[in-house]
Amino acid sequence: MVHFTAEEKAAITSIWDKVDLEKVGGETLGRLLIVYPWTQRFFDKFGNLSSAQAIMGNPRIKAHGKKVLTSLGLAVKNMDNLKETFAHLSELHCDKLHADPENFKLLGNMLVIVLSSYFGKEFTAEAQAAWQKLVVGVATALSHKYH
């Protein structure tokens, strides 16, 4: 179980409250597919993924990125109970989608990079540490069914 201090929770929620789910989610997922092209195999029904421009302009990528960040909002609201919060999604990604659990870590790291880009100086080292802790906790919770 991951324990978050009051300061870490505040750092996470202060950024989260300002996140544009569609923009940040779409960019995060799009960058994941560009930087780690082997992840594209999980999105073969999403249409044209032939170039960075095609990926970043793909409305299905943007929509799914928003969906991913909407789910991440559950983590922000349930930081002290990540394993139970993501039990269903862990089962879905393991049993039905057969997603590589390593990709959860890659996506989390990509989100931290995108948040840093969007929030600049407001995304302090302390905020980054708190967010990194959160995305690692979420990746671990999503990977639980695999063990």
Curated annotation (Swiss-Prot):
Q: Which GO terms describe its cellular component?
A: hemoglobin complex
- Recite the UniProt keywords alphabetically: Heme, Iron, Metal-binding, Oxygen transport, Transport
What would be an example GO MF term here?
Answer: hemoglobin alpha binding
Q: What family is reported?
A: Belongs to the globin family.
Q: From what superkingdom does this record's organism come?
A: Eukaryota
Q: Which gene encodes it?
A: Hbb-bh0
- Pfam families (UniProt xref): Globin
What InterPro entries is this protein classified in?
Globin (IPR000971), Globin-like_sf (IPR009050), Globin/Proto (IPR012292), Hemoglobin_b (IPR002337), Hemoglobin_oxygen_transport (IPR050056)
The segment(s) forming the Globin domain are: 3-147
What is this protein identified as? Answer: Hemoglobin subunit beta-H0
**Tissue expr:** Red blood cells.
Q: How does the annotation summarize its subunit structure?
A: Heterotetramer of two alpha chains and two beta chains.
* Organism of origin: Mus musculus (Mouse)
> Which CDD domains does the record associate with it?
Hb-beta-like
Residues noted as binding heme b in the record, renumbered to the chain: 64, 93
Please describe what this protein does. Answer: This is a minor early embryonic beta chain.
